[in-house]
Amino acid sequence: MKKICSSIFRVLVIPYVMCGFVAAQNSYTLNGLSELKEFTAGSVEETVENLTLIEPEGSEMIPESEILKLTDRVKKITGTLTMEGLSQLTTTTGLIDVIDCSEAGFVFRDCPVLSNMYAFADEDKFSVIHGDFIIENCPRVMTGAATAHLDKSFSKIREVQGDLKLTDITTAMNKPQKI
């Protein structure tokens, strides 16, 4: 019996460990400030697949300072980061440049004061977006098409491997137009 167990261990367990098995990653949808606070109160920093933060209409506003606390809890995002309806979010800086989002896709939807997309200017991390790049109804977001804004925003992105959708944003700093 001992010989059989030893053989099973060599055939099944050792290759399992040697192949660098990676456990499934968690995905999270956080609806509102209380769920965000509960999530960020956790002490384990982890890699997540998808992370969605939603400020439901009519709910308590989520302060940007609370959103940025995600960096203490999330080490890396390998799927999609979705930020939806966040009435206080003004910047990507301090969030996607701190969390490793180099393999992630992004959805920013209905964020009325989001304007600073400067974290995407990091060409090493974000020249290729490994998923969707969707910005919808974020009227203060600028494309970086203006000369003064050329090295900022998301003008360094060269490829989007998923869906690309830009609606209701400002096209250039010197000529505000909606696209």
Predicted features and spans:
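Serine/threonine-rich, low-complexity intrinsically disordered segments
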Residues: S6, Y16, A172-M173
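Sequence-pattern detector for short linear motifs
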Residues: C5-S6, V13, K76, Q161
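Bacterial N-terminal signal peptides
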Residues: R10-G20
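N-terminal capping/linker segments that flank leucine-rich repeat
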Residues: K2-I4, I8, V22-R73
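Concave beta-strand-loop units of leucine-rich repeat
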Residues: L30-L33, N50-I62, I77-Q88, I96-V113, ...
